[in-house]
Design a protein with these regions (language model features):
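Glycine-aromatic micro-motifs
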Residues: 1-143
Length: 143
């Protein structure tokens, strides 16, 4: 079994969630969860989120539990979406790391998470105070 903590466009009902189930006859298991020690940000346009380590903050998301077969099909697609190359991990938009998360049923487990990489650090950002992409403030209006 492999776990993935999603906090943005990969969460159920969001634009990229279908990637979690491509190429598999069965669906992974989904549970609401929290990751401590992270802050959630949106790029300036508000089109995508990213997480960074930040003591004292937490983010809400979904813990997705895959079978080994499901993960072998899903993770290359997810790495491509997130601009993560395991052969060159510091070169993309995101880094894939293991992080301790807690489900709403109080189960604690390690899960893969995509954290902001060095390329994202160069973009203007906005803190999502709620720590929940689904409850974020509206994007700023551009004139």
């Amino acid at each position: 079994m492999e776990n993935l903590f999603t906090y943005g466009t990969l969460r159920p009902g969001c634009p990229n969630a279908d990637l979690l189930e491509l190429g598999s006859a069965s669906k992974p298991r989904y549970e609401s969860a929290t990751a401590q020690g992270l802050a959630l940000y949106a790029n300036y346009s508000g089109s995508f989120p990213y997480a960074r380590p930040h003591p004292g903050r937490s983010i809400r998301g979904t813990l997705v539990t895959f079978t080994t077969e499901q993960w072998s099909k899903a993770h290359p697609l997810l790495d491509a979406l997130e601009g993560y190359d395991p052969q060159r991990p510091g070169q993309g938009h995101y880094l894939r790391r293991l992080w301790l998360v807690s489900t709403d049923s109080e189960r604690r487990t390690l899960a893969w998470i995509y954290l902001a990489g060095p390329r994202i650090a160069l973009e203007p950002e906005r803190l999502i105070r709620s720590g929940d992409w689904l409850e974020r403030e509206p994007s700023p209006t551009r004139f």
